[in-house]
Amino acid sequence: MSLASGGVPTPVCEPGRPWPMGVVPALIGGRAGINAAVPAPHATAVELCLFDDEGRQETARIRLAARTDNIWHGFVAGPGAGQRYGLRVHGPWQPEAGHRFNPLRLLIDPWTRSLSGPLARLANEIGYRASAPHQACAHDNAERVPRCRVVDIAEELRAGAAIM
């Protein structure tokens, strides 16, 4: 484990699998952890940001290790069900071409099965300045975005807690 900029630890990320989409519990090579698979065809990098149990403090920022076709993916041994996380995606800022990549914006995984945190003002979280839509927003929004939570669907079903 090394330290990324800002002193956030960076666990080792292995290639993992490009499926299923989202961040899910996984057993790869006999080790338990989480596998992330995020389609982002125009991205230059995708980061998985892990947070503490309350979702307040970022505990690790992990650059996904592999890309298969248009899917960025990686496996991190250790974390499992209940882990809170978000995504950051790097790429071109070209609004005229429909590309508004902004790694200062913490994103919600569209495949997450659980969110924790306030949703009331979520519609205000855009990656550009409202008064100047062709300029990227220069402020990190992590403190205002709900955290995704890794869910073990099989365990939820065994416990009778999953709603399908």
Question: Each predicted region: which residue ranges?
Answer:
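The feature marks proteins involved in alpha-glucan
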Residues: 1-30, 58, 67-71, 75-164
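Structural beta-strand segments of beta-rich domains
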Residues: 32-36
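Short proline/glycine-enriched turn/loop motifs at strand-loop junctions of beta-rich domains
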Residues: 39-45
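Beta-strand signatures of extracellular beta-sandwich domains
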Residues: 47-49
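Ser/Thr-rich low-complexity repeats and stalk/linker segments
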Residues: 62-64
